[in-house]
């Protein structure tokens, strides 16, 4: 792990995320003078929308005063994720049938923010705005939008489909386990972890086989795979559950084969032996074949 002191960009992101998260304060204050069922109105009724807009404008103005250039770009992204997480918390604790979507908002925003923060801790030299994974790919964006559209359409046309609490809880469990496994993999790999497949071996690059890597060769991908499917199980999105499973499986199969080419080039027989002993962790994916 890269030292105990968090780099400047990491500290800025923490402050930005907390500022965004402060969106939960207004409804909490309001509940002191009203009832809990008002909380959801905070997000849906006109006064609530106005309050959110003013709150965001004030926070953004503060960020513009505090930071410039690259640091502002970090802060505003972290703040956006904090706001999303905060709104998810508000919905999750509201008396509404949209509770599970609140869980989803928290899960999605936390995933993206924690990707940046953990990278800032373990491998600050590779840290960039891309570490948020917000612009991961066009396919990733389309998949996310598709899940929102499916949830909304089915919520309006087949509302009972979105009331399967046991299924949403199962999805939440998948999300928590997947998120935990991925972050454990990142922390275990330390400076060896990178969001981009490396084609050249760095001097500090070592083969990590301990911790969660003793169970799966690619624990970060295993975690991400089940996290992504879990988000759709949580939303009770039957179409996207199938779509996410197929798309994620194909993506990680190709990614693992590409990565293992580099790993065999870097570590030769050491990786081949490790590959023989430890599975990838993903169903029906064995990685690149070695003769």
Where do the protein language model's features map onto the residues?
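Membrane-anchoring alpha-helices and their flanking helix-loop junctions
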Residues: 1-203, 230-291
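Active-site-proximal inter-transmembrane loops
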Residues: 196-224
């Amino acid at each position: 792990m890269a030292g105990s002191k968090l780099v400047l960009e990491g500290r800025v992101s923490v402050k930005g995320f907390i500022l965004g998260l402060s969106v939960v304060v207004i409804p909490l204050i309001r509940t002191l003078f009203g009832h809990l069922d008002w909380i959801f109105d905070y997000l849906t009724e006109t006064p609530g929308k106005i309050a959110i807009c003013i709150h965001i404008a004030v926070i953004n103005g503060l960020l513009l005063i505090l930071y410039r250039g690259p640091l502002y770009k970090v802060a505003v992204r972290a703040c956006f994720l904090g706001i999303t997480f905060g709104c998810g918390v508000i919905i999750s604790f509201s008396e509404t049938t949209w509770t599970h979507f609140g869980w989803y908002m928290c899960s999605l925003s936390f995933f993206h923010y924690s990707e940046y923060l953990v990278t800032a801790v373990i491998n600050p030299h590779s840290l960039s705005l891309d570490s948020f994974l917000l612009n991961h790919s066009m396919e990733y964006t389309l998949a996310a939008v598709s899940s929102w559209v499916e949830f909304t359409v089915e919520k309006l046309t087949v509302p009972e489909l979105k009331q399967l609490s046991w299924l949403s809880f199962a999805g939440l469990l998948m999300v928590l386990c997947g998120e935990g496994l991925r972050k454990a993999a990142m922390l275990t790999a330390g400076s060896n972890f990178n969001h981009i497949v490396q084609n050249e071996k760095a001097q500090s690059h070592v083969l990590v086989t301990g911790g969660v890597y003793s169970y799966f060769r690619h624990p970060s991908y295993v975690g991400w795979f089940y996290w992504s499917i879990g988000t759709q199980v949580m939303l009770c999105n039957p179409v996207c559950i199938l779509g996410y499973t197929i798309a994620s499986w194909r993506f990680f199969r190709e990614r693992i084969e590409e990565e293992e080419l580099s790993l065999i080039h870097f570590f030769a027989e050491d990786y081949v032996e490790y590959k023989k002993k430890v599975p990838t962790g993903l169903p029906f994916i064995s990685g690149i074949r070695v003769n």
